[in-house]
Amino acid sequence: MQNGPSAARKFDLEDRLLEYATAIIRLTERMPATRAGNHVANQILRSGTSPLFNHGEAESAESPSDFVHKLKICLKELRETKRGLRLVQRVPLIVSAAEVDPLLRETDELIRIFVASIRTATKRQLRETPAETYHA
């Protein structure tokens, strides 16, 4: 196990993603067992729990580009979940649409974290990639 600030940050993000996935599951369990409720719940359940699993995949990436790719999948899934949560509020598909507000705020924060992580990893990748040389 790593020590220091980067290890704490990694653990914090993993823990946040675990809490986020838990909140998504709890929300979808409270949605109505109607055709629309089931459809939206299933979609949010998939996209809202995916960042937890894909972040784990990113930690075991086979290359820097694989790492960035997996982070981008997390970002894509978070953006999809945000749209689903907004739909839950708009319809509404739960008794109190305001219950979704904390999840939307956390989704926005996680999106910002992943955008920053992707930028940092991409810059690092560009710095560490040696310039290609062509021999004639």
Predicted ranges, named:
Residues 1-136:
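Amphipathic alpha-helical assembly/interaction segments
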